[in-house]
């Protein structure tokens, strides 16, 4: 029971694949979440990846130019595909 409680009370670290308009809506909603935190972004488009990362204060090391790198990251718990 304690393990489940600790997981629920911790933040789910989200990654987003594809920083488009709907991804912005999702990222804005995460700002209001008690249990979710935006941790990473993956995009093949360098400009969009950097703009999205800057807007949502994503650390450079979690701005992936390859989808598999985001999916393989042990720092990402869940992925939203936009």
Task: State where each predicted segment sits.
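N-terminal Rossmann-like dinucleotide-binding module
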Residues: 3-56
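Beta-loop-alpha module in the N-terminal Rossmann-like domain of NAD(P)-dependent dehydrogenases
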Residues: 61-82
């Amino acid at each position: 029971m304690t393990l489940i409680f600790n997981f629920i009370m911790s933040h789910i670290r989200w990654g987003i694949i594809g920083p488009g308009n709907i991804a912005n809506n999702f990222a804005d909603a995460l700002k209001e979440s008690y249990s979710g935190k935006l941790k990473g972004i993956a995009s093949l488009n360098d400009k969009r990846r950097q703009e999205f990362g800057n807007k949502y204060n994503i650390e450079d090391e979690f701005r992936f130019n390859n989808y598999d790198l985001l999916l393989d990251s042990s720092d990402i718990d869940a992925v939203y595909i936009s």
